[in-house]
């Protein structure tokens, strides 16, 4: 592993590509570790993230970064959050219709990034306010991005260009928090984020 390379474990190549662009802006190259990490079922996304990052470290035996994203819908008392995968599998393209029927489109996109160096687990998260679109976007590869419109915008994340999305997305904001977190750790020296 080179001085400024960090492993990122995900089976989702599109997610890796987006985070890779965002970390590259800070001089960190992400190396893709293509693995589908089995997820426990829990509403609490921090518990899911902790479990995922431990499993990723056990498989890779190297410092590793993982993410977990979810949606919190106001009309559903902040659900589905950690149960997002199951929620999406059941509702598929009916998420927008559900928000219309409940007459409350407010939602937050939540994303966690976790880092394990073999000794400790560190994590950061970001909650991005917005709303559920009236109609599922036909564009994009992330199911959440196809239904979520960030506050102050009129289109879903999936309808934005990569450059536009990279300037405002929840992934950008959690990446910035992760850079600060990594900078504060001994591993930050190895990544070139601070001097020893």
Positions of the model-derived regions?
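Anionic-ligand binding patches
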Residues: 2-7, 14-196
């Amino acid at each position: 592993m080179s001085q400024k390379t960090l492993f990122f474990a995900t089976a989702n190549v599109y997610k890796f590509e987006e985070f890779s662009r965002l970390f590259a802006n800070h001089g960190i190259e992400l190396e893709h570790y293509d693995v589908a990490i089995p997820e426990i079922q829990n509403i609490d996304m921090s518990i899911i993230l902790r479990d995922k990052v431990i499993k990723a470290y056990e498989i890779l035996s190297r410092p590793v970064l993982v993410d977990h994203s979810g949606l919190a819908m106001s009309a559903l008392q902040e659900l589905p959050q950690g149960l997002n995968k199951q929620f999406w599998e059941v509702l598929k393209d009916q998420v927008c219709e559900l928000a219309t029927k409940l007459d409350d489109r407010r939602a937050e996109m939540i994303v966690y990034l976790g880092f394990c160096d073999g000794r400790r687990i560190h994590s950061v998260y970001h909650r991005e306010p917005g709303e559920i679109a009236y109609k599922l976007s036909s564009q994009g590869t992330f199911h959440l991005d196809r239904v979520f419109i960030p506050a102050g915008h009129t289109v879903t994340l999936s309808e934005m260009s990569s450059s536009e999305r990279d300037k405002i997305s929840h992934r950008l904001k959690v990446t910035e928090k992760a850079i600060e977190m990594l900078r504060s750790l001994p591993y930050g020296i190895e990544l070139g984020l601070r001097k020893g």
